[in-house]
């Protein structure tokens, strides 16, 4: 069974998806490089990456911040939905009216909407002098509020309901199959958003362009959606985040 799944993931649509994920991480890595190394990239025709990192408090800056969040969402959220996509791919072998690309496009469309809202929030926080232009929190109060929000959300019924669907992708697709791949992709994206939006906003605490934070957060969200072990992570993570919020507020970090 495992060998069959590995072979199936060698097909074109899977390779394209892995290419999107890899490209997103590669661009984020390039954007996170120190400015002198990014400038050196101009010699190799990579000056466009330098321009992407020039974030300014105007419309062009908002576009760049939105692009940054889009890359983050693709890099971090696409890996967390791989088990659900594998389930869909298995069903597609026996059920008609399937389209893997439409499903993924619908899913990513939801995260595009989130990225736009997150970029607007980042610019608003910047104008309030609560974060830097690159989204790093300048306020212990803001960091503490985001941590306690994410921590308490771990215990919410909404989070639990969304996680239950993420952990049972077979039941999810069978329930909504007749809606078609595009609408199912959007619905899957909304369910994922319901699971992860609060954790994603912790980028303002960990650093929007902090690759270590992104990597850790991605692994946590992937594990949390696994049916066998995810349930053992959700509430302890919530306790840890609430405790961290208290520590940040008291320490003024």
Where are these regions (language model features)?
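Juxtamembrane transmembrane-helix termini in multi-pass membrane transport proteins
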Residues: 6, 65-108, 112
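Interfacial loop-to-transmembrane junctions
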Residues: 7, 219-243
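Small-residue-enriched transmembrane helix starts and helix-helix packing motifs
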Residues: 53-74, 143-150, 176-188
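Transmembrane alpha-helix/helix-exit interface in multi-pass inner-membrane proteins
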Residues: 112-127, 140-167
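Hydrophobic alpha-helical transmembrane segments in multi-pass integral membrane proteins
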Residues: 115-122, 191, 195, 244-253
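Alpha-helical transmembrane segments and their membrane-interface junctions
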Residues: 118-126, 193-212
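A mid-sequence, solvent-exposed acidic-amphipathic segment
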Residues: 152, 157-198
């Amino acid at each position: 069974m495992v060998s069959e799944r590995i072979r199936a993931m060698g097909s074109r649509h899977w390779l394209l998806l892995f290419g999107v994920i890899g490209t997103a991480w590669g661009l984020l890595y390039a954007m996170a490089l120190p400015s002198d190394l990014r400038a050196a990239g101009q010699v190799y025709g990579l000056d466009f990456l330098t321009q992407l990192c020039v974030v300014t408090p105007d419309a062009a800056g908002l576009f760049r911040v939105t692009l940054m969040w889009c890359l983050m969402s693709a890099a971090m959220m696409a890996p967390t939905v791989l088990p659900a996509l594998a389930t869909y791919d298995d069903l597609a072998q026996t059920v008609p009216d399937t389209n893997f690309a439409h499903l993924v496009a619908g899913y990513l469309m939801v995260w595009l909407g989130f990225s736009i809202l997150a970029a607007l929030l980042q610019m608003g926080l910047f104008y309030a002098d609560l974060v830097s232009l690159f989204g790093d929190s300048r306020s212990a109060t803001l960091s503490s509020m985001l941590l306690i929000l994410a921590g308490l959300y771990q215990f919410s019924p909404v989070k639990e309901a969304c996680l239950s669907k993420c952990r049972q992708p077979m039941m999810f697709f069978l329930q909504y199959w007749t809606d078609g791949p595009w609408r199912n992709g959007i619905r899957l994206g909304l369910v994922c958003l319901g699971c992860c939006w609060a954790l994603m906003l912790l980028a303002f605490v960990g650093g929007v362009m902090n690759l270590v934070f992104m990597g850790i957060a991605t692994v946590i969200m992937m594990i949390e959606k696994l049916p066998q072990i995810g349930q053992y992570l959700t509430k302890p993570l919530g306790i840890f985040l609430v405790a961290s919020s208290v520590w940040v507020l008291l320490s003024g970090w």
